């Protein structure tokens, strides 16, 4: 049976080991660089030093809230905003309908001046919760009628969520606001060895995917 009707011989040029070896070494080096640097890149800390406003993502653990309060006391912050979507667990047991209000109450229990605390609840959403929280903050800030010269705010969040959170809040508040960020390390693992812990690996993967989705979103 002749195969000439259906198949034709072709010559394929393949790289030799002199090509494959540098490619393999380059891949290994690039992978090593990613492993050692990606966590720090996602956990960015770049505050606006003279900002008089702070926002805390309400879902974060208490060590982040404490860090934000200490920062606010040290830097003479005028107002602390707390963001958060409606509670998705324990709403029948909790006195707080949203994470924003729960975080605000936590601040008060920690000794914060209640006159400086302003919850900024977000709408109930299934996806893009960080974006919803950023929009909730924008609505609260618009009601404050803050002078243009004072439109500087620092965002406090947990670990690897910092980079993506800052992207959302910058986009929501627009160019008239300077948005800084402070990433407080998770108490669950040491950042330098994040790949040894399931929480660290999950955080890096989740945030990497989230950033990719956000970059592709209109």
Placement of each model-derived feature along the sequence:
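N-terminal type II signal-anchor transmembrane helix
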Residues: 4-45
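A generic structural signal for solvent-exposed, polar alpha-helical segments
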Residues: 5, 77, 200-201
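Amphipathic, soluble alpha/beta structural segments
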Residues: 11-13, 85-88, 204, 212
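A transmembrane-helix-recognition feature enriched in membrane-embedded lipid enzymes
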Residues: 195-218
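A structural signal for short, hydrophobic/glycine-enriched beta-strand patches
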Residues: 39-196
């Amino acid at each position: 049976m002749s195969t000439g009707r259906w198949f034709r011989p072709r010559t394929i040029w393949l790289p030799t080991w002199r090509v494959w070896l540098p490619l393999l070494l380059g891949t290994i080096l690039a992978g090593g660089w990613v492993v050692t640097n990606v966590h720090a890149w996602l956990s960015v800390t770049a505050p606006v030093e003279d900002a008089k406003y702070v926002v805390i993502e309400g879902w974060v653990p208490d060590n982040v809230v404490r860090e934000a309060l200490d920062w606010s006391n040290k830097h003479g912050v005028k107002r602390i905003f707390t963001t958060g979507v409606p509670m998705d667990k324990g709403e029948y047991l909790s006195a707080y309908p949203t994470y924003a209000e729960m975080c605000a109450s936590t601040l008060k229990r920690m000794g914060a001046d209640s006159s400086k605390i302003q919850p900024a609840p977000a709408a109930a959403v299934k996806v893009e919760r960080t974006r919803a929280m950023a929009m909730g903050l924008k609505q609260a800030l618009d009601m404050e009628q803050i002078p243009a010269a004072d439109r500087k705010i620092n965002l406090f969040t947990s670990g690897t969520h910092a980079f993506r959170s800052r992207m959302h809040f910058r986009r929501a508040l627009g160019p008239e606001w300077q948005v800084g960020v402070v990433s407080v390390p998770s108490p669950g693992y040491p950042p330098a060895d994040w790949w040894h812990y399931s929480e660290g690996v999950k955080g890096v993967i989740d945030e990497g995917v989230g950033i990719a989705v956000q970059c592709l979103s209109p």
